[in-house]
Amino acid sequence: QTLGGYWSVYWYEGRIYGTEIARGLDVFELTPSEYLSANEIAAARMAEQGRTVNPQQQYPVTWPAHPVVARAYMDQLARDKALKADVASRLTAVLDAATPLVDQARRSAAVARDLRAAAQALDVSGNGPTAQRLTALRDTLVRIADRVS
């Protein structure tokens, strides 16, 4: 009988590294599906974990103020049917305007104002995963606004 399975699995710089008992090291890369969007994968690649990885230290993971991170939250909310179409449309438009500004380190007071207005318009009531995602989306929009203002 062959014993198999993973001793440990870790995410680092866009890949999943697994220490498999029988084979050794497996390296996987995620692909978009109905359960995971391209935006979520791109946002995960942006996660700041530090250059040295020691999972036992359990450093907090942070994400930059970037439109792809906001879009990842939007995808999660849309998958749960927790984002109204008109809100999603408005958010998409303002993130479309913000993306080249962030990518090219440019500023726009008008786009920053629109981002803050979109953040303020989000209904972040209740608790649970939906409220946590809405709060994270709102906070990300404000941080993007700060970055482009």
Language model features with spans:
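Feature marking well-ordered beta-strand scaffolds used for ligand recognition
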Residues: 1-77
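Mature extracytoplasmic or organellar-lumen-exposed domains after removal of signal/transit peptides
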Residues: 45-149
